[in-house]
A protein has these predicted regions:
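Primarily ABC-family ATPase nucleotide-binding module
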Residues: 319-364
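Hydrophobic alpha-helix/TM-entry signal in multi-pass membrane transporters
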Residues: 24-29, 65, 69, 134-135, ...
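Membrane-integrated ABC transporters
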Residues: 1-42, 55, 59-65, 83, ...
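Juxtamembrane loop-to-helix connectors within ABC transporter transmembrane domains
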Residues: 46, 107-152, 209
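Transmembrane helices of ABC transporter permease
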Residues: 32-33, 65-80, 141-192, 265-276, ...
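Cytosolic ends of transmembrane helices, especially the final helix of ABC transmembrane type-1 domains
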Residues: 88, 196, 219, 243, ...
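Transmembrane-helix motif of ABC transporter permease domains
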Residues: 22-42, 51-96, 104, 115, ...
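Loop segments that connect adjacent transmembrane helices in multi-pass transporters
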Residues: 100, 104-121, 192-242, 249, ...
Length: 364
């Protein structure tokens, strides 16, 4: 499930995570597309209803339109339920696969890989699987659905007047620039924050492991001093990450205000110039409200996306460790009768990453 390759980017790890379940994820996106299209039935239906009311045509057509709009809302809710079911299955599968993979890999990791690592502390990374589980729902449902609704909403607005086309293209470019300019730094600060989070947990585990030593030493201040040190580092890292989030939130809010002002102004001018009727204007305002709601979801999902990508990077601290080779001799079967002879000629040994040779020119 998790790629066993070094120096994978968090995004590459994410694609590796979802690739085995691409069929289910494809269904989630299909439901999201249909949901985005069905959502547009609400403003279009209301536009048609207002036009009928203005024309004093309150007849069976009006009743049918009301029924169809209500049916569209219900169908959209049903699509969301289908999405939730698929994502829940994926979450359960991710947890199960991760647990099995950890259990398989841990006994097979090369011994030299543990020389500079503390295995029990490294297993804390498994808790990031829960973060990935919860965040996957946001990424696959909220983020994708909101993005599609923004695109579909802007496309629909473009049919009302060519001015909306230019405005929509400008807004899409601005969203892309916001993510491009801030996403990389946000991920870096999120990973740094997570690093100090685990250092804090590791120190607390060490205090718990050596609790008898601290009791016998009397009123030791070491637990509090070191806790204060690692916690301060965590708070610094968290504040750095929050500043990036704050910057992104600010830019998205500015984008939201600009979009609201622009769309309302263009719509109002078109109504006064009689290039749009009241029904179209009301429908456009409903679309704008839907776009605002989608942008709010995008803003709220940013931190979750960082958490998922950071979690994958932290889980990689275990899954990237090299495994022992499984091929070789079956000593019990091949050597039970004849025995086995081992000969060393000019044998040298040093630990991985160290320059100093521990054993040199050994002959046996």
């Amino acid at each position: 499930m998790f790629e066993n390759k070094s120096k994978l980017t968090p995004l590459e790890r994410f694609w590796g995570l979802i690739h085995p379940d691409r069929k289910e994820i494809k269904n989630v996106y299909i439901y999201a597309i249909f949901s985005g299209i069905v959502n547009l039935s609400l403003p279009l239906g209301i536009q048609a209803i207002i036009n009928l009311i203005q024309g004093a045509q309150i007849n069976s057509s009006w009743i049918i339109l009301v029924f169809l709009v209500t049916l569209g809302v219900a169908f959209n809710g049903l699509l969301n339920i289908f999405q939730l079911r698929i994502v829940e299955n994926l979450q359960q599968k991710i947890f199960t696969k991760a647990a099995i993979e950890f259990a398989y890999r841990i006994p097979r990791i090369k011994m030299e890989q543990w020389q500079k690592k503390y295995a029990p502390e490294l297993m804390n990374r498994f808790f990031d699987i829960v973060t990935i589980q919860k965040g996957l729902s946001t990424m696959l449902i909220d983020f994708s659905t909101s993005s599609l609704q923004i695109i579909f909403g802007l496309i629909l607005l473009s049919f009302y007047h060519p001015f909306f086309i230019i405005f929509s293209l400008l807004l899409i470019v601005l969203i892309g620039l916001i993510f491009r300019l801030t996403a990389k730094k946000g991920l870096e600060t999120s990973i740094n924050e997570s690093t100090y989070k685990y250092k804090t947990v590791h120190w607390l585990e060490e205090v718990a492991r050596t609790t008898l030593t601290f009791k016998l030493s009397g009123d030791s201040t070491l637990p509090l001093k070191n806790t204060d040190k690692v916690t301060s580092k965590y708070l610094e890292a968290r504040e750095s990450h929050f500043q990036i989030l704050l910057k992104q939130y600010g830019l998205m809010v500015a984008f939201k205000v600009m979009m609201t002002l622009g769309l309302l102004a263009i719509g109002g001018i078109l109504v006064m110039e009689q290039e749009m009727n009241i029904g179209q204007f009301v429908a456009a305002e409903i679309i704008i409200l839907m776009l605002m709601n989608s942008i709010e979801k995008l803003i709220r999902s940013l931190e979750t996306i960082y958490d998922v990508l950071t979690g994958l990077e932290k889980v990689g601290a275990v899954t990237d460790l090299d495994l022992e080779k499984s091929e070789g001799m079956d000593m019990e079967k091949d050597c039970s009768e004849c025995g086995m002879k081992i000969e060393l000629v000019d044998f040298n040994f040093r630990y991985p990453g160290d320059q100093k040779i521990i054993l040199k020119a050994i002959n046996l």
